[in-house]
């Protein structure tokens, strides 16, 4: 084989490798799947229970009460699918729930190894196909772009969490739609209004640490094909601001098809949302071109202090709530504004009861209620 032949083969191999992802991009805007809006009727909710095997016993114990509270609120109207690391953890969780007088009738346990608790980002995405069959999509999870642990200086490991969608699909006998080679996308990076509009920050999607070289047009084509969304509200976001590169669901979500739930401008600025993004958010339009109504919820009055007395140095957001069948689980912080926020959010859901969930210790690790829940529609 001469040098010229080797050179040509090398060029061809490189060309094919570089274009693999482009070949897999949707070439049309045909809608193959539609994601039910979060507030539609649930079969259940998925939780990945904290354990000791990645971050230790103190981490696990600090988060247990939040998971017990969420389970207690959810079991009254839907299944709670609890992912336990192993049988020892399952037995421990059952003991915790029994101690808290949580009935186990609606609790379903799965034993899967996990790395952490963020099922919104790594968990199954349930969608309906053209025949109205419920299937599971696996969008891949690489730890928000292969992030480095600040304390250890090592790559954060999420190989176990990345397998959760396929394990659930196998156990449930559901079709798995593997989107890993097309796009990497966390559940918390997108919110949808239930009427064809998706809102997201570019920083957590059009980022080389997830989707190298992907354009906005390509991302929109994927979201149209696989989630059924045709109208897009893009904020720039800020790459590197925190571990997620600024997920949208921390500061802006859809309350319903006509309402965006967010904060006043000063609170958004305090929450590190850029002024240019605030302007885009407030100017957002529905699929039909009309404006949304805005429901604005304040930040906490004070900086969040964990249950062990650690002052985090920043305020808490109430936007990252979760809508269950007959409850709305709202992050709470032992703050005077808990009651204010709960009351404001309650006005949007008159047929559901708002339940405050203490997330102070979870918030220290970057998340709230929506981040650690994942709905399974009927």
Predicted regions mapped to residue ranges:
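Positively charged n-region of N-terminal signal peptides that target proteins for export
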Residues: 1-5, 19
